[in-house]
Swiss-Prot record:
InterPro entries: Cys-tRNA-ligase, Cys-tRNA-synt_Ia_DALR, Cys-tRNA/MSH_ligase, Rossmann-like_a/b/a_fold, tRNA-synt_1_cat_dom, tRNAsynth_Ia_anticodon-bd. ATP binds at residue 268. Its EC number is 6.1.1.16. It comes from Sulfolobus acidocaldarius (strain ATCC 33909 / DSM 639 / JCM 8929 / NBRC 15157 / NCIMB 11770). Zn(2+) binds at residues 30, 208, 233, 237. Binds 1 zinc ion per subunit. Its cofactor is Zn(2+). SMART domains: DALR_2 (SM00840). The gene is cysS. It catalyses: tRNA(Cys) + L-cysteine + ATP = L-cysteinyl-tRNA(Cys) + AMP + diphosphate. This is Cysteine--tRNA ligase. It is found in: Cytoplasm.
Length: 469
């Protein structure tokens, strides 16, 4: 098995992966702030990390994945004020959209902690930072992290603390303009919780430090998110967490690259934000997953009608190859393989190895997929005609491993589909008999019925095969 290597944003280099526990990988990924619909950029991160989790599991790791829900934040309060709705109504509505999108994309999360369910733990975390001299309380009741108390601040992002534009934060009550809020004092009309410093609510960065430590312990393996979170969010998380714990908090920082739309940055000002639920309705979960994972997670990806159509076509070709594989496997195996078949089998074994080599090299799904394409090509050009049983079995295993990671061909591997395949095979075989007897009207009628069910008949010289449309 190839050693597993991944790019660590902390250090900006490829490193050999070694989890704290050799059998378990603990991962925390920053989830959405639920004030609006999740969009296709969020979907890229959800599926990108899902591909990483799935490959880790394929290698035998037990993976614990935590992804938070930020359900109290400036943006949520602003949206509530704009709409005249209670902030909790806003949160519930968009949390439902988020959860439904995850389910559609077949992304499984072990823990989904919400900020408002961990207020006391956040308060305790902040108090400990105050006690250790890493945070200070202001006259307004806000609590700020003292960035100068953490000498390695900026190591993760490569940014200087002075570069941080903090927008609306109250600079005048801070020791330094770059200090950031751990606890925000209450303002009239805002939700609040009681604390030792008065009424208020958590700052953005403290919530992730608190909840990740709560569910994964004081040290865990992977902290992930979009590349836009490196600074200041993840930089601030690292500062406050390691200041409190006094040791390395996270081993590997992993970030997914930007998604653009027709080569332009996705933004509200350009009016080009595409809600994930709309993309799911248009393209379907499998095509979207396939499109996301066709590009390596650290490379930017551009959304366009053309690229999605290409993804749909490419996925269908793989499904067609799978149909041929199944048709060969159900035949009587030969007593031995000839030289041509043995050569094909060796090539498939080599390509399976290259698939794992690519996935082990910083989860390079794009290169891994290219090897699956080559196996599919062997199915179309060799196995389809030689009816090589062993070659088909090897290709079947390659597609099984591919689907374990990509999750785009689950139907082809589900038990219920085994029965359905047998039924369709029987119908097609009956049609072959009818064609042999030159009963073309009836055979054409069967073709029409199957077509209405989304099944396309492919007539050959001797017999017919089929595939899903």
């Amino acid at each position: 098995m190839n050693p597993l290597r991944l790019y660590n944003t902390l250090g900006r280099r490829i490193e050999t992966f070694e989890s704290f526990d050799p059998l378990t990988v603990k991962m925390y990924v920053c989830g959405p702030t639920v004030y609006d619909y999740v969009h296709i950029g969020h979907g890229r991160a959800f599926v990108g990390f899902d591909g990483i989790v799935r490959y880790l599991k394929l290698r035998g790791f037990n993976v614990i994945r935590v992804q938070n829900i930020t359900d109290i934040d400036d943006k949520i309060i602003k949206r509530a004020n704009e709409t005249g709705k209670d902030w909790r109504e806003i949160v519930d509505y968009y949390t439902k959209d988020y959860m439904e999108s995850l389910k559609a994309l077949k992304v499984e999360i072990d823990q989904h902690p919400r900020v408002t369910s961990h207020i006391q733990e956040i308060i305790d975390f902040v108090q400990k930072l105050v006690d250790k001299g890493h945070a200070y309380i202001t006259s307004s009741g806000s609590v700020y992290f003292d960035v100068d108390s953490f000498p390695s601040y900026g190591l993760l992002s490569g940014s200087k603390k002075e570069e941080w534009n903090q927008g609306e934060e109250i600079v005048k009550e801070k020791k330094n303009p770059y200090d950031f809020a751990l606890w925000k004092a209450w303002k009239p009309g805002e939700p609040y919780w009681e604390s030792p410093w008065g009424k208020g609510r958590p700052g953005w960065h403290i919530e992730c430090s608190t909840m990740s430590t709560r569910y994964l312990g004081e040290q865990f393996d992977i902290h992930g998110g979009g590349v836009d979170l490196v600074f200041p969010h993840h930089e601030n998380e690292r500062a406050q967490s390691e200041s409190l714990l006094g040791k390395i908090w996270v081993k590997y920082w992993v970030h997914v690259a930007y998604l653009t739309i027709n080569k332009e940055k996705m933004s509200k000002s350009l009016g080009n934000i595409i809600p994930l639920n709309e993309a799911l309705k248009k393209w379907g979960p499998s095509v979207l997953r396939f499109w996301y994972l066709s590009t390596k997670y650290r490379n930017s990806i551009d959304y366009s009608e053309q690229t999605l159509e290409q993804a749909r076509s490419s996925l269908q070709r793989l499904k067609d190859a799978m149909g041929i594989i199944r048709s060969v496997i159900k035949e009587e195996p030969k007593s031995h393989s000839n030289e041509e078949e043995i050569s094909t089998q060796r090539e498939i074994i080599s390509l399976i190895g290259k698939f794992h080599e690519a996935m082990s090299n910083d989860f390079d799904t794009a290169t891994a997929l290219s090897n699956i394409y080559e196996i599919a090509n062997l199915v179309f050009t060799k196995i389809q005609y030689t009816r090589d049983f062993m070659g088909a079995m090897l290709a079947f295993d390659a597609f099984r491993q591919f689907n374990y990671v990509f999750g785009v061909m689950d139907e082809e591997f589900s038990p219920s589909y085994e029965t359905m395949y047998k039924v369709i095979d029987s119908v097609v075989e009956i049609r072959n008999i009818l064609r042999a007897r030159k009963m073309y009207d009836l055979s054409d009628e069967i073709r029409s019925v199957l077509a209405n069910a989304g099944i396309k008949i492919l007539d050959g010289k001797e017999k017919s095969t089929w595939r899903f449309e």
